[in-house]
Amino acid sequence: MRFEGKVAIITGAGRGIGKAIAERLASEGADVVICDVDKEAAERTAEEIRSKYSVKAIAISADVANEGDVNSMVEETIKNFGRVDFLINNAGITRDSLLLRMSEEEWDKVIAVDLKSVFLCTRAVIRHMMRQRFGRIVNISSVIGLRGNVGQANYASAKAGIIGFTKSAARELAGRNITVNAVAPGYIQTEMTERLPQEVKEEMLKQVPLGRPGLPDDVAGVVAFLCSEDASYITGEIIRVDGGMAM
């Protein structure tokens, strides 16, 4: 069990990609903190993990765009486990609209949840990682942050911002044996994408050379690799998990 004795915080882990990441890390021995604004979803995920794996899993309801909530989340983690080794900044939302119609609230909300949260969570954990002289931070960006998308100026800006943040943080923290990397998923089959109109899904699939949507487990496997010793000499990287979509 390569992550035995390690503690991971995963934001937005109540469902979808975040849940898959939490399950993957737990399956390899990590104790996990399931953070989600949806308290019931977080508790369900934590309960499922405890029933399947011989690890500890706690659920914390938090708004990761709120500094107080984030600091409390990290304090609760330290209180329960005494350390934090992995931070997976996965929480994110969309509020799609053409620029001409996009409201300031739609812009601000996406930037806060998708980008500001990455700053707040990272800042809150690094003092503990510095003390340990060890840490792995993985930020979930998107291919939309690399190529843009009609109707998603807010989301694309937030996800592009994560890429710049990842590279800057990687430079700042490397001397403390803390790596910071990002994963940029493409079209991944989740509850959110399943709600899209069929014609939209078909159009997205045409852009994927591998000819299929990705699965949350595809992303989780790359995150687990970046947390492992196999990736100890990798930092500041942006790894696309997109079936070739953004080649």
Question: What are the functions of these language-model segments?
Answer:
Residues 98-99, 106-111, 193, 204:
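Substrate-binding pocket helix/loop in short-chain dehydrogenase/reductase
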Residues 2, 130, 134, 178, ...:
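C-terminal substrate-recognition "lid" of short-chain dehydrogenase/reductases
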Residues 2-33, 169:
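Canonical Rossmann dinucleotide-binding motif of NAD(H)/NADP(H)-dependent dehydrogenases/reductases
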Residues 142:
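Residue(s) in the substrate-gating loop at a strand-loop-helix junction
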Residues 122, 158, 166:
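Active-site helix of classical SDR
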Residues 127, 171-175, 232:
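Alpha-helical segment proximal to the catalytic Tyr-Lys
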Residues 39-40, 61-72, 104, 218:
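The beta1-alpha1 cofactor-binding region of Rossmann-like NAD(H)/NADP(H)-dependent oxidoreductases
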